[in-house]
Every structure is written in structure tokens, then in C-alpha cells.
């Protein structure tokens, strides 16, 4: 059995295929994720699994250099924003973009996976930009 944190085969595969500057997104239950090979649906019921738990686990296995968040999270979900900031290194650049741009980036060619959680708080979506480990 796999020893590292992520047991889901689709998330493991997405992370294994990521190169420098590639993206992986983690999203709330309401994000309109395209129904293609990049969709990884973990949602079981409302708030299961939670966005922040999935993010924490992914960060154990993925080296990131930058994150993208919806500008709207500042006003509509400051608690989630604070939790995200607690999880990431202060060296990681945070870029705020309009939520509509977050949605359009789900189909970006550099995006290797779109994880859907059961999260039901607004604007709980993040794009992780990969870094190298050397």
C-alpha cells in the first residue's frame, strides 16, 4: 500500500505528471468544472471532504511557487483565506484574480487536474502553480 499522504489514484497521477509552471486546482462543490479527463470529483456530501483538508494533503506532495485565488475571497470568505495563508509558506506568491478568470483557467492547457471537494463556503477555489524540487 502507498505510504505517502495521497491515496486517491487520480490525484496521485495528476501530481506525478506535473512539471514546472503546471497547475492543479482544488475547488468548492459549486465550481463549474469541465467534465473531462482532468476532473477529479471527491465530493461526497456538503463539506465532505473540506477544501482546506484536501489542500493541506496536496501541499504535502506538491512543490508550489505561486497560488491563484479569486479576488472575491477577501470580502466573501476571509476565514478561508486566513486558513490558506496559514498552510502556505510566506515565500509563496499569492495572486488574486477575478472569479470569472478562475473559472476560465479550469480548461487551461497547463492545468493537469481539477479537484472538486464537498466545500460549500464561497470562493473556496485555488490554483497551485508548480515549482521544481531542485
From Swiss-Prot:
Domain of life (superkingdom): Bacteria
Q: Which residues act catalytically here?
A: 20
Pathway-wise, it operates in: Carbohydrate metabolism; D-ribose degradation; D-ribose 5-phosphate from beta-D-ribopyranose: step 1/2
- Where does it localize? Cytoplasm
> What catalytic activity is recorded?
beta-D-ribopyranose = beta-D-ribofuranose
Q: Which SUPFAM superfamilies match?
A: RbsD-like
Known EC number: 5.4.99.62
GO-annotated biological processes: D-ribose catabolic process
Keywords attached to this Swiss-Prot or TrEMBL record, sorted alphabetically, are: Carbohydrate metabolism, Cytoplasm, Isomerase
Q: Name one GO molecular function term.
A: D-ribose pyranase activity
Q: Which GO terms describe its cellular component?
A: cytosol
Q: What is the recorded function of this protein according to its Swiss-Prot or TrEMBL entry? A: Catalyzes the interconversion of beta-pyran and beta-furan forms of D-ribose.
Family listed = Belongs to the RbsD / FucU family. RbsD subfamily.
What name appears for this protein in its UniProt entry?
D-ribose pyranase
Amino acid at each position: 500500500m502507498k505510504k505517502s499522504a495521497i491515496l486517491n489514484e487520480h490525484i496521485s497521477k495528476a501530481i506525478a505528471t506535473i512539471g514546472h509552471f503546471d497547475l492543479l486546482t482544488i475547488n468548492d462543490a459549486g465550481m463549474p468544472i469541465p467534465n473531462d479527463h482532468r476532473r477529479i470529483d471527491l465530493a461526497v456530501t456538503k463539506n465532505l471532504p473540506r477544501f482546506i483538508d484536501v489542500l493541506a494533503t496536496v501541499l504535502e506532495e506538491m512543490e508550489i511557487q505561486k497560488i491563484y485565488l479569486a479576488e472575491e475571497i477577501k470580502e466573501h470568505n476571509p476565514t478561508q483565506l486566513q486558513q490558506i495563508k496559514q498552510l502556505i509558506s510566506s515565500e509563496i506568491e499569492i495572486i488574486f484574480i477575478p472569479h470569472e478568470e478562475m473559472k476560465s483557467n479550469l480548461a487551461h492547457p497547463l492545468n493537469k487536474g481539477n479537484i472538486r471537494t464537498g466545500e460549500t463556503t464561497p470562493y473556496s477555489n485555488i490554483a497551485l502553480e508548480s515549482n521544481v524540487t531542485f
